[in-house]
């Protein structure tokens, strides 16, 4: 009898034997365990994205509750969580092999309660300095780092041929936290939900009350619930354990840096647009109540990410990624035609429609590039181990470890887009009064990614899967 059967029934326990590439093992035991861990991971990651992007909904409302921050400062608050999130993704990407997926998921979800509670109190006190908001926004970045450890953890549970779909679901539905937050926050800030905990509203010109603290506090009970779910419901895989020394060599691979650049263009665009879209829309079309519509772009992008992984499993990640970058460049060019000039003209409907297309392609590309990473690093590692005369078991174990480390590190690079995009919009507006300068940079970058994808991966059919 396998040693894995008992732990599979006892959630939260360590599974000492895990062979997802064995069809019989996968059918009889593996699929059930992997699915349970995936469906606990998804809401934990979704909540993390809610917290990570809190300031995309809070910053635009700060002037309404009495704070006199400049537009550039507000853009900065939306951008900073991506800085800390990107930096923290590097160590987070190595945490699962060091501490275990169950323990780390529970810990990394639970600590997000801290910035949520603090932000709720801070927005109710107009004497709160800008420096305090900077600290809170940086703490929200811990939520963004969860993506690296979550994706690394799930990658250990699934066989190679199912990783694109599994990572697409985990990442895509997790990314949906951005749209969930941008949908829920405008609704709950109009309700007196937490009066018993000190929440009070600020009267608006139309006589309504704005309870901005609710945008942060609404996530606290859910974070507590899913922290417990992760602790008691997920499993540790003994085969996923690896020292830091075993994981670091992946940083020497040239493909790591190439794929980091491509992922920056896809996921970086998704998270950057998610962070900055509401503020950008407010500056270009001030009469539009953008928070009524802001959630839909991230929602489409999150769904597209799930689809991007599954489509890439069938058609090949390189092919999907290449076509996707062409579309991103086209839509970026179209965006110039939708903007007002000197505050005159422009079409919000066209602007919104083109941005939805950009969210869609950014989401698809996030899924397809992650599928490429998984395929590329598994093949590189297995070929290396076999060339050294290693066993199939060693090859599969090291391939899983290298792939998880690569996924985590590359996700850290991608998250930087969440800082650069809103900061680029803010700087362009401050210097020229228009976001056009930033948009030109994005367009050139997407065109460069088309060339890089084709030159490195697209010319050789053996790399297309």
Over which residues does each language-model region extend?
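C-terminal membrane-cytosol helix-exit motif in multi-pass small-molecule transporters
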Residues: 190, 218-240, 452-456
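Central cavity-lining transmembrane alpha-helices of secondary-active solute carriers
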Residues: 76-94, 295-308
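Hydrophobic core of transmembrane alpha-helices in multi-pass small-molecule transporters
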Residues: 115, 129-145, 346-366
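Extracytoplasmic
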Residues: 36-67, 181, 273-278, 421
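Extracytoplasmic gate region of multi-pass secondary transporters
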Residues: 55-60, 253-302, 306, 366, ...
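Conserved MFS/SLC helix-loop-helix module at the cytosolic interface between two early adjacent transmembrane helices
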Residues: 87-130
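C-terminal ends and interior cores of transmembrane alpha-helices
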Residues: 110-126, 326-345
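Glycine-rich segments within core transmembrane alpha-helices of 12-TM secondary carriers
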Residues: 144, 164-190, 407-421
